[in-house]
Regions:
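Structured mid-to-C-terminal alpha-helical surface segments
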Residues: 1-213
């Protein structure tokens, strides 16, 4: 096992033989910067798919933070997998209540400030124009057998509809993003209380926004 060490993260790959005899891998990515999360983690019960009676507890990120980060990744990367996730969210009618929209929108703004910069209109256009060949190569082989036909145009339009619902930033959220562009970290413009305190000294913010200042 060989670790690849980058700026604030360590990566490696573990290879194994699956139950069908195929060679597969698990990719480990340890991010040493993104260790201060916005919302309090939650504990959920998980079930072993091979042993139905085997239930165990797992500590995980808040669903709002998970989906906020996922939608930020969609804007940044526009990969077929990200598009499919947003399409699924829209098809299932998830997160339509004002409170959940606000919680996710704040996370999108926060994680956008920790990225290399995203032109939102250009990102939405890239989603719309993602070639069908990319879906055939990168997404369709990952779907369960018998999933059924997936319409690329429907998928991309639903993904754009989904993420657009979370992009109407408030005045404070816009002010936060503008401050971040100038190297000023102002989490108080996004959050208050425990959330603001939790990310006040986030090393990722110092690395990406204030450049270590």
């Amino acid at each position: 096992m060989c670790w690849r060490i980058g700026n604030g993260n360590h990566q490696t790959e573990l290879y194994y033989r699956s139950a069908t005899g195929n060679r597969d891998k698990i990719k480990l990515d340890i991010n040493c910067l993104s260790r201060c999360h916005v919302y309090e983690p939650v504990v959920r019960d998980a079930r072993n798919p091979f042993l139905p009676d085997d239930v165990f507890s797992v500590r995980m990120l808040s669903e709002y933070e998970l989906f906020g980060a996922k939608l930020k990744a969609l804007l940044e990367r526009n990969t077929p997998r990200d598009i499919f996730d947003a399409y699924t969210m829209e098809q299932k009618g998830l997160y339509r209540v004002d409170e959940s929209v606000s919680l996710i929108r704040k996370c999108i703004a926060y994680y956008l400030s920790l990225s290399r910069g995203v032109d939102i209109e250009q990102a939405l256009e890239s989603i719309r124009k993602r070639p069908i060949q990319d879906f055939k190569k990168q997404l369709f082989p990952m779907l369960k057998t018998g999933y059924g036909f997936v319409d690329r145009d429907l998928m991309t339009s639903e993904a754009v509809k989904c993420v657009s619902r979370f992009l109407s930033f408030t005045e404070n959220e816009t002010a936060y993003l503008e401050a971040a562009k100038t190297g000023e970290y102002r989490p108080d413009l996004l959050f208050e209380g425990d959330s603001a305190e939790r990310i006040a000294e986030n090393p990722a913010a110092k690395f990406y926004i204030t450049k270590g200042a």
